[in-house]
């Protein structure tokens, strides 16, 4: 922490959001796969429709994915796909 009180400190939540999104999507993906679903198809169905029943309740996956806003998920997926940081 700086001793200079003339400057405003900034707090960046974007790294936390990125890490949280990745963690939750990985857990949801694994739960869907363990239950025998195609995780990509199920996640796409959820992201397009907003219907949480595309996500299994197994391991609390549905509750986990609902902690994230769909637009935040899409933002992180697109940034990852395009390798934008």
Curated annotation (Swiss-Prot):
Pfam families: IreB. PANTHER family: UPF0297 PROTEIN YRZL. It comes from the Bacteria. This is UPF0297 protein Cbei_1105. Belongs to the UPF0297 family.
